């Protein structure tokens, strides 16, 4: 059974929640095995804080309740839709299993409730360990992005070669191990691994952080 290890970088108390735990048991779709098969393999990240921002593209300016939690530049603001990077919540993932794909996706309620959509992407996690990257784009630039603590922000899924395999998601809580992992990750160059993000796992392309779990 594939195991995904992860740590919370922004706030150690942040935890990924199985999407199945957030769906009311009374919904009729919970009787569908196809629906349930995906839900138990999908996890939701929620906001650990209250947060708000607004964009003024004419002045290349972003007003924000916590500006230290944003990353952006002029190019991102001036794209057809502004793209802004949130540094929360942030998780670092690792697996020792081969050919496990990591899928980062938006959560449908953010477009309705929070005025943003998370930008999706995926890659072969077995070949590279990296932090989740929460880039968002605004739905309506004339409105603020307003996030309340506990609001869902994005979803992640993990795809093994056999899609019928269950996924074990294991959170690391030992602070020394967490710091060791974060330090090791920061010392590695992502550039060297980009050609392997979408390739099949081989011994020589195996993620370099396995020593942390020996």
Could you tell me what each predicted segment is?
Residues 1-131, 137-214:
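Non-catalytic terminal segments and appended small domains
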